[in-house]
Structures are given as structure tokens and as C-alpha cells.
């Protein structure tokens, strides 16, 4: 029997409600695949502020570091809005990424056939299929480069610096190509190499890394063209590889194409496959504890965890298939409900997925 320690951070708002369902699903998967998951619950975000006076206690970092992966619910809420920046719940996410060395953000965007009416795009575009993954470099680039504000010739002037070295590009490129090997074996690297030196280094390095993955088809697009192509023909994309700032923008654009944010998972990973997995939606404190939140993004985050951190691809496919089956049978939580479908609560949705595993 395989055994894995999983750090669990329920967090704030609906976090505990949806994490509960994901843990339930993983436990069932463990029974099916002769695997034992040892879940260790720790605090971060507002939950940790209330308990310890800080958003990211040392105990949480230590437990995460000694685990195979981290399953996170959601952090934040208006209750803590008046705290200074460094003490706010959201600082826990930045702190965890830094402490755990998570440099690659993986954001899938998939339109389920039965939910395509939620997409803002025309049916003829969606009908071609949308199932892509944005791989974004997370801890380099312009967000972390030299910056400042100063007077130049008597005029207030601000600057930020886009900077990458070869090693930083190599490691994120490897993450993208490895992800593509699990998917349709196609990588689109996105840059602005017609203007930026940093992008020219990016493109040159990605080309070098691609030689190690002869099965994967590589293409390059400028970021402005990519933004256009995402709404014109999203079916052309499998894995999109890009830097921090471009990925920040493109991953949000891709998520909006689906029209159902409650369905979208994400992960932040590093070279050894360790990662932190969470839904992209917020903590929605107004519906916390009411059994109406959609747990599917959290359940799909657990599927990503099993695929990318535990090398349990078959189990991940099982979970994804169970989710799709429940949707095809017409079950919906309030956020994706339309007339003619069957509305269910958080716990019942989790049970429905469980039954179909």
C-alpha cells in the first residue's frame, strides 16, 4: 500500500465546506487504488489570524514542507480588510509559495459540453472544444525585478524591470513540456520577442528545452496575438507556456472563456512535483456554512494533486470522469444552475461524485 501525507488548509469562508468534500473523494480514491492518505489539517489566512494573530504560522509551513502536497481551500474575506497589507490573509498565499519554492502555476480551463451555455463565446467557437492549460512562471519577471520611483529631469518617473535568466526559463519550460506529455503533446510558448530582450532569451531557451521532448509539438506566439486567438479559436491550444505578467493576464482570460469559475482548479508546483492545489475562486464568506457552495473546483484540484504530485494519473482521470458524469446527469449547484437541471447542495454534490467513482 502506498502512503502519502497531505497538508490540508481549509482556510476561510466556504473553504472548509468544499475541502471537506475533496477529502471525502480522495479517501474513496485511496480505497480503490490501495493508497492511504494521511490528512493533516493546518491553518492559514484569516483562520490563522483569528487563532494565532498571523496569516501564516510556522507550524503550517513546517507541516506543508513535510507533506507530499498541499490541498488549500480559500483565504480572505471582508472581516480582515482593515488589516495592514503584511497582516492580511492573502499574504499567506505569497508566503507559502515562497517558503515552498513554488515557481510554476498551472491553470486549466475546460468547457464542459453541458455547461457551454455559460461561456460568453459563440456556440460555434465552443463546439470545437476548449480544454487548455496555462503554465505561468510565478516567482520571476517584472513583478519581482528592480523597481522604483524617482525624479528624472524634475518629472516623477516610475520603473519596473522584466528580468529572467536561463535557469528560470528552463525550469518553467520543463514543467510545461512535462504537463504536455500528460495531455495532447502540444506547447504554445507566449512572449513578446519582437520587442523585449527578456522574451528573446525566453524563446531561445524554450527552443533548447524542447529538444528534450521530441514528441511534443512546440509553437511560439506573441502575447497580443495569443489574447486574440484565445477568444477566436481556443480549441487550438493545449498547453500555453508564458512568463509571470503575461500568464497573470492570459490565465484570467482563459478562465472567463469557460463562464463557470466554480469549476476551475489550479496548482502551484516546483521541480520535484511537490505542489499546492486550490480552486481559483474566492472564499465567498456570504455563503459559508450554508451548504450551497460548488465543491467541484476543489474536487478537481484534488484530482490535479493526484496527477501532478502523486503520479496517480489514472485516479485523477477517474475523478474527472465522475465529475463529468454528475454534470451530464443534470445535477448543479446554485452557481451553475439553470432551469431544467437538478439543484443540489455542497455535500450532496460531493456524494454524487463519490457514488460515481
Curated annotation (Swiss-Prot):
Enzyme Commission identifier(s): 1.1.1.85
Pathway(s): Amino-acid biosynthesis; L-leucine biosynthesis; L-leucine from 3-methyl-2-oxobutanoate: step 3/4
Stored Gene3D superfamilies: Isopropylmalate Dehydrogenase
Compartments (UniProt record): Cytoplasm
Annotated signal peptide: none
Metal-binding listed as a keyword: yes
Catalytic reaction equation(s): (2R,3S)-3-isopropylmalate + NAD(+) = 4-methyl-2-oxopentanoate + CO2 + NADH
Statement: the UniProt record of this protein carries the keyword Cell cycle: no
A GO molecular-function descriptor: 3-isopropylmalate dehydrogenase activity
Residues the record marks as site: Important for catalysis: 143, 192
Reported function: Catalyzes the oxidation of 3-carboxy-2-hydroxy-4-methylpentanoate (3-isopropylmalate) to 3-carboxy-4-methyl-2-oxopentanoate. The product decarboxylates to 4-methyl-2 oxopentanoate.
Family of this protein: Belongs to the isocitrate and isopropylmalate dehydrogenases family. LeuB type 1 subfamily.
Name listed for the protein in its UniProt record: 3-isopropylmalate dehydrogenase
Natural source organism: Clostridium pasteurianum
Amino acid at each position: 500500500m502506498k502512503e502519502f501525507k497531505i497538508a490540508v488548509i481549509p482556510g476561510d469562508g466556504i473553504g472548509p465546506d468544499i475541502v471537506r468534500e475533496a477529502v471525502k473523494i480522495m479517501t474513496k480514491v485511496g480505497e480503490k487504488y490501495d493508497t492511504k492518505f494521511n490528512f493533516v489539517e493546518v491553518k492559514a489566512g484569516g483562520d490563522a489570524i483569528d487563532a494565532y494573530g498571523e496569516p501564516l504560522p510556522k507550524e503550517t509551513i513546517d507541516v506543508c514542507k513535510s507533506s507530499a502536497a498541499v490541498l488549500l481551500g480559500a483565504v480572505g474575506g471582508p472581516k480582515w480588510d482593515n488589516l495592514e497589507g503584511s497582516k492580511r490573509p492573502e499574504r499567506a498565499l505569497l508566503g507559502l509559495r515562497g517558503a515552498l519554492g513554488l515557481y510554476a502555476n498551472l491553470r486549466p480551463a475546460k468547457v464542459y459540453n453541458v455547461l457551454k451555455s455559460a461561456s460568453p463565446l459563440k456556440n460555434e467557437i465552443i463546439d470545437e472544444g476548449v480544454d487548455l492549460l496555462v503554465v505561468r512562471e510565478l516567482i520571476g519577471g517584472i513583478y519581482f525585478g528592480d523597481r522604483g520611483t524617482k525624479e528624472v529631469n524634475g518629472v516623477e518617473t516610475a520603473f519596473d524591470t522584466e528580468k529572467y535568466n536561463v535557469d528560470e526559463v528552463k525550469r518553467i519550460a520543463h514543467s510545461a513540456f512535462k504537463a504536455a506529455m500528460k495531455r495532447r503533446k502540444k506547447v504554445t510558448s507566449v512572449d513578446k520577442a519582437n520587442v523585449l530582450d527578456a522574451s528573446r532569451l525566453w524563446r531561445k531557451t524554450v527552443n533548447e528545452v524542447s529538444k528534450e521532448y521530441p514528441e511534443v509539438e512546440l509553437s511560439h506566439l506573441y502575447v497580443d496575438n495569443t489574447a486574440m486567438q484565445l477568444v477566436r479559436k481556443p480549441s487550438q491550444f493545449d498547453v500555453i507556456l508564458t512568463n509571470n505578467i503575461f500568464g497573470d493576464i492570459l490565465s484570467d482570460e482563459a478562465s472567463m472563456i469557460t463562464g463557470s469559475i466554480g469549476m476551475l482548479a489550479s496548482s502551484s508546483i516546483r521541480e520535484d512535483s511537490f505542489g499546492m492545489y486550490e480552486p481559483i475562486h474566492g472564499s465567498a464568506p456570504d455563503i459559508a456554512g450554508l451548504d450551497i457552495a460548488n465543491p467541484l473546483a476543489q474536487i478537481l484540484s484534488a484530482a490535479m494533486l493526484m496527477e501532478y504530485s502523486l503520479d496517480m494519473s489514472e485516479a485523477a482521470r477517474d475523478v474527472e470522469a465522475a465529475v463529468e458524469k454528475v454534470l451530464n446527469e443534470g445535477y448543479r449547484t446554485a452557481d451553475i444552475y439553470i432551469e431544467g437541471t437538478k439543484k443540489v447542495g455542497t455535500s450532496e454534490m460531493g456524494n454524487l461524485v463519490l457514488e460515481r467513482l
